[in-house]
Amino acid sequence: AVTTDSFVVNPLFFKGGNIGKLAVCGTVNDLLMRGATPKYLTSAFIIEEGAELNELKLIAAAMSSAAKEAGVIIVAGDTKDIEGNGGIYINTTGVGFIEGEDFASAKSEIGDAVIVSGSMGDHHAAILSHRMNIKNDITSDVAPLCDMVANLIKNGIEVHAMRDVTRGGLGTVLNELADASGKCFE
């Protein structure tokens, strides 16, 4: 399985992570949602003039740490400088191997349970809170879901489909699962 994604987040740093951790975890989790074991990542940075070197170092360190936690190797990278105001954008491509079942959206069945991995909305709430300078204890839950998915499989849980709810929210994901499988949610 192969997936690619671009990450543009403002602020670059937020409670619980930064754009580097988000890029690695997002790509790893996309592979996991297909039933693939993530193995390799590539990364390309687009860096606007004025970006802080210390921020780049922290972002790269977060990527390295997240890759190690997920058991993946970052095998290639690229950087491009562009005019701008210090923004940093990251594109990652991930490669993983499907050893068992491909968890395709079309495999959802009537009677399937919908299980979420944690509280909903923490990541976006943490980012929005930072943008709006709202003081609270909300922390992004950005993390590789390798152990969680491995435990589902190891414990014989019959998985038909998995999705990362990051983009579009739960309602969008449920609609996509229903459309792909020709079913509906009631």
Where are these regions (language model features)?
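Helix-biased detector of long, well-ordered alpha-helical tracts
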Residues: 1-186
